[in-house]
From Swiss-Prot:
Source species of the chain: Salmonella typhimurium (strain LT2 / SGSC1412 / ATCC 700720)
ABC transporter domain boundaries: 2-230
Self-association and partners: The complex is composed of two ATP-binding proteins (ThiQ), two transmembrane proteins (ThiP) and a solute-binding protein (ThiB).
Protein name: Thiamine import ATP-binding protein ThiQ
Gene3D superfamilies found in the cross-reference section: P-loop containing nucleotide triphosphate hydrolases
EC number from the UniProt entry: 7.6.2.15
PROSITE patterns in the cross-refs: ABC_TRANSPORTER_1 (PS00211), ABC_TRANSPORTER_2 (PS50893), THIQ (PS51288)
Length: 235
């Protein structure tokens, strides 16, 4: 589904270079120290950064130079990027039509995702009238209503309390399984990664330093465990 072949981003004197393959429906966590290049990797996939070289394939098609708005990708950030002057209904509708002129089918999709997110009763409220968790549900609904096959999460739930964060992670995981979406999620928490992603990638110094089973990473047995401050449980 998603393949990066020597995708290179020139960051000062440190070229970041990524080679990666992710299958359709796979849920993958991206971990690593601060400044390692995790968000850069997502931004290259989303098209917000243009690589100096390399190839990016999605579903077999070359999207290396495709503008972000035309890529089969949706991305959710820690900052939800909701428009404060638009209500929930309108913010979700932007995912379908930037002009907010929706036909009957699009309105049905908008209302269906709002119901699935549990925010159908909030449709006329402005973002400033919502809690942090509710705002992230709206932002996630706007991503999902676009029905793109790849979903990118850049620590969107890190500011939420642990119980709400776990609830949102479970919701995302369930929807991805239901729709067979390919998910890549940047996180600073290996525990969060373990809840949603059987496979993890560790990024260090602009490279993929390790990839494998999240459980192995969490146990401290992986070669990259020490990069994340995880010690082996074996005495």
């Amino acid at each position: 589904m998603l393949k990066l072949i020597d995708i290179t981003w020139l960051y000062h004197h440190l070229p970041m270079r990524f080679t990666l393959a992710v299958e359709r429906g796979e849920q993958v966590a991206i971990l690593g120290p601060s400044g390692a290049g995790k968000s850069t990797l997502l931004n290259l996939i989303a098209g917000f950064l243009a690589p100096a070289s390399g190839t990016l394939l999605i579903a077999g098609d070359d999207h290396t130079l495709t503008p972000p708005s035309r890529r089969p990708v949706s991305m959710l950030f820690q900052e939800n990027n909701l428009f404060s002057h638009l209500n929930v209904q309108q913010n979700i509708g932007l995912g379908l039509n930037p002009g907010l002129t929706l036909n009957a089918s699009q309105r049905e999709k908008r209302d269906a995702i709002a119901h699935q997110m549990g925010i159908e009763s909030l449709m006329t409220r402005l973002p400033g009238e919502l809690s942090g968790g509710q705002r992230q549900r709206v932002a996630l609904a706007r991503c999902l209503v676009r029905e793109q096959p790849v979903l990118l999460l850049d620590e969107p739930f890190s500011a939420l309390d642990p119980a709400l964060r776990q609830e949102m992670l479970t919701l995302v995981s369930d929807i991805c399984r239901e729709r067979q979406l390919t998910l890549l999620m940047v996180s600073h928490s290996v525990e969060d990664a373990a809840r949603i992603a059987p496979r993890s990638i560790v990024v260090a110094d602009g490279r993929i330093a390790w990839q494998g089973k999240t459980d192995e990473l969490l146990s401290g047995q992986a070669s990259a465990s020490a990069l994340l401050g995880i010690k082996s449980h074996i005495l």
